[in-house]
């Protein structure tokens, strides 16, 4: 063998601490205090799980692999992604595990900082500069906060469905407060066992009617219209600053890029762990549904925070996880 080639091969084996003898296991270490330019061994861990996955992919299926993660919160903006041929085998599995009993969290969210006091017990924070997602969930101190809604509890009732029984209905005077920014408003209407969640297009305050951006209820089956189950179906409205009046409620003004939140009396705004989601999934495995997905194990890891945005034309549930396709 050419001596230069031999030297290069030995360098990579030593530098990356990779043992390729039969029966051995490849171990890559990750720490929040690591460095993605390091070799990933015990004394020189990598910083991100993504880099660890990238480094081991050429060896997946050839020997057992463990990505060992030290205590900490690891934030991702896109899911950890694998193809069907990158998932190990029965003899050579891929494991992504916490080190000993360390607390390891993989989070698809971004923490909010620098809250400012507004009036009426409300605090606000500006969205991160590079954050461009729409979202409808805010996590505060490890719980899902309540999106500002009206009424706070129970429901309103439709006075009468509009002529097409699909895209608009009438309401009673003073049913809900006058909303300044209708473009941020969402309607949630109950169809017996399912719901429609859809953006409001306009509100005619003179004629007391509300119109949505598309059909309320799934287009098929055809009976998913406004008044099929109840002549005066239940509904509530979400995401208006006028509704943000109770502890634990929040509202987002997407035009101003600001979130408003009403803390509970026992919450210190400076210690608030408020997270908005960014990653649409946490783990994504590509492949045909009939393919063997391989052998990948996650052990001792907590997964938190994902972003699911309702379709632009609305989410209309049907049954058994089926919903109206409006892509």
PLM regions and their residue ranges:
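Hydrophobic h-region of N-terminal signal peptides that target proteins for export
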Residues: 10-19
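Boundary at the C-terminal end of the N-terminal hydrophobic targeting segment
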Residues: 22-23
